[in-house]
Amino acid sequence: MGSKKDSNFLEKIAKRKFPYIIAEIGINHNGNLNLAKKMILSAKKSGANCVKFQSFVADKLISKYAPKANYQKKYKKTQLELIKSCELKTESLRKLKNFAKNKNIEFLCTPFEIKSLKDLIKIGIPAIKISSDNINNTPFLIEVSRTKLPVLLSTG
């Protein structure tokens, strides 16, 4: 749950004289932990203050009948299979968080549903980033509010 330390996350950003740069890694690691670590190192080397990943359970978000986006059509897998291959399990997220901490770069992760939110709370995140597609998801936002963590809210 939220703590004084967690509220310092937003204070730390607000009191800066320079922009706070969050490197969006998202799912570009393709489910590969080593690639994700290389991306963290690249973000750090580029001057980012923070890296941000995405956490989700594909089966809870995507129908097995969902059509593929244009860029996905070259693959034989379904959209669900493609996105599922980018999932990071809780233990992988914990490893990435610890790796980022050891490299002195902040770790954030956007949860897309309640299970992912609860998993991120278990590994200890300083804030919750809400994606714009969840901005009207009242049950999810209620769960987020119960964490008492600072929230970064995308609007589009």
Model region roles, listed by residue range:
Residues 32-43, 111-119:
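Short, acidic/polar
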Residues 22-23, 48-60, 106-111:
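Short beta-strand segments at enzyme active-site cores
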Residues 24, 43, 120, 154:
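Conserved, mostly hydrophobic/aromatic
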Residues 38-56, 123-124:
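Catalytic domains of carbohydrate-active enzymes, especially glycoside hydrolases
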Residues 49-87:
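Glycine-rich, proline-tolerant flexible connector loops at the mouths of alpha/beta enzymes
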Residues 1-23:
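N-terminal amphipathic alpha-helix/helix-capping segment at the start of soluble metabolic enzymes
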Residues 26-28, 56-58, 112-114, 133, ...:
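Active-site beta-loop-alpha junctions enriched in small/polar residues
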Residues 73-138, 146, 150-153:
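Active-site beta->alpha loop and helix N-cap motifs at the rims of alpha/beta catalytic domains
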